[in-house]
Amino acid sequence: MTQGAKKAPVIWVQGEGCTGCSVSLLNAVCPR
């Protein structure tokens, strides 16, 4: 969980350009 939290910010920065990446990350962090 700790490693994922550290990698999350990097993914978020790269995901700013593509909504799909952000959505995928959200689903990975808190799937509904």
Curated annotation (Swiss-Prot):
Record bears the keyword Oxidoreductase: yes
SUPFAM superfamilies documented for this protein: HydA/Nqo6-like
Subunit relationships: Heterodimer of a large and a small subunit.
EC identifiers of the protein: 1.12.99.6
Cofactor binding, per record: Binds 1 [3Fe-4S] cluster. Binds 2 [4Fe-4S] clusters.
Binding site for [4Fe-4S] cluster: 18, 21
Protein name (database record): Periplasmic [NiFeSe] hydrogenase small subunit
Main location: periplasm
Organism from which the protein derives: Desulfomicrobium norvegicum (strain DSM 1741 / NCIMB 8310)
GO cellular component: a single term: periplasmic space
GO molecular-function term, one example from the UniProt record: 3 iron, 4 sulfur cluster binding
Enzyme class: oxidoreductase
Transmembrane portions of the chain: none
Keyword Metal-binding: yes
Compartments, record wording: Periplasm
Cofactor(s) needed by this chain: [3Fe-4S] cluster; [4Fe-4S] cluster
